[in-house]
């Protein structure tokens, strides 16, 4: 390992690589299978060093796109090293290992562990670090082709690359440990020697540094882990010894991506490594957490905080999230956690100093904080979020012999005695079911998930990656007056509404939205905004308490292709919540979608998205792929054909809500003196009558808008033009096409061969409205002047 020549990625490049990994549908195991017979990489030997060209092929197979040249070159140089010299400690593949001298191994074990965990002076994660001089000579930055053409060009060992990338993937820690073991067990004898373990630990340390861990804490922990893994002291580590050692090293589990879903309610902490912005003390040893990176481990459920070195000690357990009593009526007691409460005491209202870690404590459930001498009643009522929170005394067990799953959606073996839980909420409360899509908004969803785990009971917060909305809906199925908070984009909201339909509720629960990411047209219409920007979640929860209800129309989308045509792309949804369009805007959206899948790092902000949309709109203006759309479609509104022969259109949009493309209103505003609320649902196509038609998301009517071209679409999107051309307002729409055309529903585009499309009303879903926007100073001035 001493001959290794590391070139660190910058933090921006590491984030860029993670985004590519998140967008890819492939796993490392899938790509390794390509080296087998019949695979796309079958002509290469994965056990031998690979060149830059093979490295690019491997990364393309894994990420499904070509990496940008600077990132690809820098990543290759980060793994490049001189060919390894075979030593007795690292036997050749297929060779039988001679039995080592156990005493020599034990005496040298600590030294080897020190070497594996030693500081890597050539891998500091600085943004400006350049390749070493030796590598620059072999592979100049400006000429990546020299990486392959030079006779002494650097190479990489595929094992190192695979181990590194596998640490970035989601999955169970025990699966990652087993995967890395089998990856480095080159002779397949079921044993790892010290050199092989050193290589794995080296990759772990590099990933940890990119994640802003403080290596001064992690190195001695990994050193101790290596020393203790070899339980029988025979000089080698078996698979079971490797997994047992890794699964009992909590900082390593956090690095591997600890799955905390199974620890809810059983008193186990769910740890995350954290950087503290203010002085913080260890709850075990009382010493301050030091360091410039992420200094310590913090439980996402109760905020119990410890050093990495203290986490393996005998520490207090986490809070219980449910009750052991089989009947309601149990009195809820405070669940105290000491220290790290730099706020005012809720009794004496005096400030609590950060160093008073022993003299003050706070309750996990109600958030009340007291000096020890100021504590009042021991009874906890849930605090300011008591209308939403499920206290542990409200989740009671019901034992029974049942084949299937628990009431919270988890699966049990046949005939196994499982513990079911029922929710008995406090009178007058409205328990909140929180469903979080961790993939929404980049990493924003993951942070939101952790915050809600602390603000509410972890039992009522569900990760949509673990079985979707169904487990949470099943857990709350018989709970009266509960509400749902959907955390994600419009697609996540539609997914949750579909699952609510299938859950057969007697009364559908109302749904509020915490929008993550960009776009979020439905959330905008419901006044929840275009995207969460880091405000107080407690404030949002208080706003939900006062939210009025509105019924959202939902529509069937039936696409019937003609029998004689070939199958096109798969239709994304058969339910429409927001809008459907065909023609120029769908063509732009399709190009936008394809480019975002290929280069996700270029679409990480609303401003960048608008610029890309403008570029695609400009190119579509010259291409005019949907010119003379009226020659290729027939439009019927409530069974009446709309004459398009005298209208030169390149696109048609069917609207349910007054927002599209992140806030664009294609229907336009209707002046108040012209607005007419229609009592009948008869189709309206007369241009004069359409000027008076008001758009409403709960009127069981659709609005049909025509678009003249990409230039007009761009003007509407950028605010230079108010709206498109109103064609109709009706309760059902039928469209027939005679050629391949771009289409989209709720922001998901596809290419559709000739077909018949029918849009009819499905049902209405109760949604919660956000608070009305506060009037600005200038609007108040205008109002006061008008009164004068």
Curated annotation (Swiss-Prot):
Residues 427-561 form the DAGKc domain. Its main location: membrane. InterPro entries: ATP-NAD_kinase_N (IPR017438), C1-like_sf (IPR046349), C1_DGKgamma_rpt2 (IPR047475), DAG_kinase_typeI_N (IPR029477), DGK (IPR037607), DGK_typeI_N_sf (IPR038199), Diacylglycerol_kin_accessory (IPR000756), Diacylglycerol_kinase_cat_dom (IPR001206). One of its GO terms (biological process) is phosphatidic acid biosynthetic process. Residues 83-93, 111-125 have a biased composition (Basic and acidic residues). Pfam families: C1_1, DAG_kinase_N, DAGK_acc, DAGK_cat, EF-hand_7. The keyword Metal-binding applies. Expressed in hippocampus and cerebellar Purkinje cells and weakly and diffusely expressed in the granule cells. It comes from the Eukaryota. A zinc finger (Phorbol-ester/DAG-type) spans 268-318, 333-380. Residues 95-109 have a biased composition (Polar residues). Gene3D superfamilies: 2.60.200.40, 3.30.60.20, Diacylglycerol kinase alpha (1.10.238.110), EF-hand (1.10.238.10), Probable inorganic polyphosphate/atp-NAD kinase, domain 1 (3.40.50.10330). One of its GO terms (molecular function) is calcium ion binding. It is found in: Membrane; Cytoplasm, Cytosol; Cytoplasm, Cytoskeleton. Ca(2+) 2 binds at residues 230, 232, 234, 241. It is an enzyme of class 2 (transferase). Keywords: ATP-binding, Calcium, Cytoplasm, Cytoskeleton, Kinase, Lipid metabolism, Membrane, Metal-binding, Nucleotide-binding, Repeat, Transferase, Zinc, Zinc-finger. Pathway: Lipid metabolism; glycerolipid metabolism. The activity is calcium-dependent. Requires phosphatidylserine for maximal activity. GO terms for cellular component: cytoskeleton; cytosol; membrane. Its EC number is 2.7.1.107. Disruption phenotype: Homozygous knockout mice show impairments in motor coordination, long-term depression/LTD and development of Purkinje cells. The level of phosphatidic acid in synaptosomal membranes is significantly decreased. The number of branches, the total length of the dendrites and the membrane capacitance of the distal dendritic region are significantly lower. Diacylglycerol kinase that converts diacylglycerol/DAG into phosphatidic acid/phosphatidate/PA and regulates the respective levels of these two bioactive lipids. Thereby, acts as a central switch between the signaling pathways activated by these second messengers with different cellular targets and opposite effects in numerous biological processes. Has no apparent specificity with regard to the acyl compositions of diacylglycerol. Specifically expressed in the cerebellum where it controls the level of diacylglycerol which in turn regulates the activity of protein kinase C gamma. Belongs to the eukaryotic diacylglycerol kinase family. This is Diacylglycerol kinase gamma. It comes from Mus musculus (Mouse). The gene is Dgkg.
């Amino acid at each position: 390992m001493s001959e290794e020549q590391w070139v660190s990625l910058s933090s921006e490049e590491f984030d860029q690589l993670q985004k590519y990994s998140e967008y890819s549908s492939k796993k490392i195991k899938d790509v390794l299978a390509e080296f087998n017979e019949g695979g796309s990489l079958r002509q290469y030997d994965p056990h031998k060093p690979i060149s830059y060209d093979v490295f690019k092929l491997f990364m393309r197979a894994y990420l499904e796109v070509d990496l940008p040249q600077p990132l690809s070159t820098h990543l290759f140089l980060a793994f490049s090293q001189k060919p390894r010299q075979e030593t007795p400690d690292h036997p050749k593949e297929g060779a039988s290992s001679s039995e080592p001298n156990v005493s020599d191994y034990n005496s040298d074990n600590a030294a080897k562990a020190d070497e594996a965990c030693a500081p890597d002076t050539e891998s500091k994660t600085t943004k400006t670090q350049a390749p070493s001089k030796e590598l620059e000579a072999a592979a100049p930055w400006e000429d990546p082709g020299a990486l392959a053409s030079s006779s002494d060009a650097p190479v990489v060992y595929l094992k190192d690359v695979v181990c590194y990338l596998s640490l970035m993937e989601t999955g169970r820690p025990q699966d990652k440990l087993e995967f890395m073991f089998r990856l480095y067990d080159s002779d397949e004898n079921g044993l790892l020697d010290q050199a092989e373990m050193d290589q794995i630990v080296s990759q772990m340390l590099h990933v940890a540094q990119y994640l802003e861990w403080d290596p001064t804490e992690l190195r001695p922990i990994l050193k101790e882990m290596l020393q203790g893994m070899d339980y029988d002291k025979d000089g080698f580590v078996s698979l079971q010894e490797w997994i047992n050692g890794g699964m009992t090293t909590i900082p390593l589990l956090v690095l591997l991506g600890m799955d905390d879903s199974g620890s809810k309610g059983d008193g186990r902490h769910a740890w995350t490594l954290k950087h503290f912005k203010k002085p913080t003390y260890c709850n075990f040893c009382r010493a301050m957490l030091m360091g410039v990176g992420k200094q310590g481990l913090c439980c996402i459920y109760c905020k119990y905080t410890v050093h990495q070195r203290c986490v393996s000690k005998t520490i207090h357990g986490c809070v219980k999230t449910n009750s052991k009593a089989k009947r309601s009526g149990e009195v809820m007691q405070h669940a105290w956690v000491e220290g790290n409460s730099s706020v005012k005491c809720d009794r004496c209202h005096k400030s609590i100093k950060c160093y008073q870690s022993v003299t003050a404590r706070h309750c996990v459930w109600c958030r009340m904080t007291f000096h020890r001498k100021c504590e009042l009643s021991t009874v906890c009522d849930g605090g300011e979020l008591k209308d939403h929170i499920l206290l542990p005394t409200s989740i009671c067990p019901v034992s029974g012999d049942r084949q299937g799953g628990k009431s919270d959606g988890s699966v049990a073996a046949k005939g196994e005695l499982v513990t079911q839980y029922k929710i008995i909420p406090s009178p007058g409360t409205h328990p909140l079911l929180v469903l979080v899509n961790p993939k929404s908004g980049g990493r924003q969803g993951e942070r939101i998930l952790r915050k809600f785990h602390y603000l509410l009971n972890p039992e009522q917060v569900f990760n949509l990656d673990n079985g979707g909305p169904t487990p949470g809906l099943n857990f709350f199925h018989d709970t009266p007056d509960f509400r749902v908070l959907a955390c994600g984009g419009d697609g996540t909201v539609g997914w949750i509404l579909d699952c609510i339909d299938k859950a057969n509720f007697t009364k559908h629960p109302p749904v509020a939205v915490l929008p993550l990411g960009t776009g979020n047209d439905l959330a905008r219409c419901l006044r929840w905004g275009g995207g969460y920007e880091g405000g107080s979640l407690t404030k949002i929860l208080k706003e939900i308490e006062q939210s009025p209800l509105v019924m959202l129309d939902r529509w069937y989308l039936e696409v019937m292709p003609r029998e004689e045509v070939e199958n096109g792309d798969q239709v994304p949804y058969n339910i429409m919540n927001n809008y459907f369009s065909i023609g120029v805007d769908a063509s732009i959206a399709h190009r936008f979608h394809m480019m975002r899948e290929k280069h996700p790092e270029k679409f990480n902000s609303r401003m960048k998205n608008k610029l890309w949309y403008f570029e695609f709109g400009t190119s579509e203006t010259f291409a005019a792929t949907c010119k003379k759309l009226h020659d290729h479609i027939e439009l019927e509104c409530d069974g009446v054909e709309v004459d398009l022969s005298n209208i030169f259109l390149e696109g048609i949009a069917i609207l349910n809500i007054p927002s599209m493309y992140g806030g664009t209103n294609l229907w336009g505003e209707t002046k108040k003196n012209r607005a007419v609320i229609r009592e009948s649902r008869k189709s309206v196509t007369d241009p004069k009558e359409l000027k008076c038609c008001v758009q409403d998301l709960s009127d069981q009517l659709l609005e049909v808008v025509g678009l003249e071209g990409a230039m007009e679409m761009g003007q509407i999107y950028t605010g230079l033009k108010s709206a498109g051309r109103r064609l109709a307002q009706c309760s059902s729409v039928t469209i027939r096409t005679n050629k391949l055309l771009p289409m989209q529903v709720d922001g998901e585009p596809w290419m559709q061969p000739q077909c018949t499309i029918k849009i009819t009303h499905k049902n209405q879903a109760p949604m919660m409205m956000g608070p009305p926007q506060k009037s600005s100073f200038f609007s108040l001035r205008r109002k006061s002047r008008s009164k004068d």
